[in-house]
Amino acid sequence: MAAAALAPAAAQSAKGIDLENTLYLDVEYGRVVIEMRPDLAPNHVTRIKELVREGFYDGIVFHRVIDGFMAQTGDPTGTGSGGSGKNLDAEFSSEKHVRGVVSMARAQSPNSADSQFFIVFDDAPWLDRQYTMWGRVIEGMEHIDAIKKGAGQGGAVSDPDAIVQIRVAADVKE
């Protein structure tokens, strides 16, 4: 009985973070901690965790980075046109796209999100209710700010920074 009572606490860190719904995204500049929001986008969070646990994102570049707007990654081709091959239906919410929010990138169709995601550098209200928000940066936003920016409105980055690795916090033994 005592072990069962302790089980939920095992999934919480000393800081009260839900480790099963927290990502450690490591870049050259340091660790970024992302709190995932299964309450907003349960299917997206499930898929992101599947991809993370497969090592899908490790080594993938931030191919599109627009200063003052966002940093986009998650395309294994590094071109902005690739993905994992599995589209997800939109899970739009009323949450606001503010600094540090993590959302899925998509094509024209609302149901075309796959593996690409972006982190906003600043508030972006024009994205609200248009993109599936599945998390937010809770530590290390300065490392996202340090990512090399692209040129022009398209934000294509020559010699882009890459994700070193992403891990679900519950899977990391520290």
Region locations from a protein language model:
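Cyclophilin-like peptidyl-prolyl cis-trans isomerases
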Residues: 2-174
